Amino acid sequence: MPALNSLAAKPFDTTTTFADRISFVHIYVVEPHPKAPEVSPYSGNVWEAQYSTKIQPHTYEQRCANARDTGALVTGRQLMLVDALTPGANNPVWCTYGTCPNCAFLIRQDGTVDTVHTWFNAASMESAMRTLLAR
């Protein structure tokens, strides 16, 4: 999960609306804009942003530490998971679901992906959640 910023703040407002009917899971993956001198996985260059506070983890333990720090910002009934970072199994969730820095997925209880956002849009996702719950 990228460092939380103003673009990512809205999901946490949405969780309070649907907390009793939808489970919210955050997955901590690669840092899109790690703190220098680390490079972005998207550009291959240093690409810091104002919210770049973490280095790119090189071990699973470092990634878990970053996730704990970020998880402290997650409130309510939400789950924070950490993508794998081991030789031969690096970033399976990030690689499988899309290497986007701010994506979101609405997944039905049967495991079917209902809605995909390659760049999270709170209003659109909220609409998709309401539609899914109305079925």
Language-model-derived ranges and their functions:
Residues 10-11, 46-50, 102-106, 128-130:
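Short, surface-exposed linear patches
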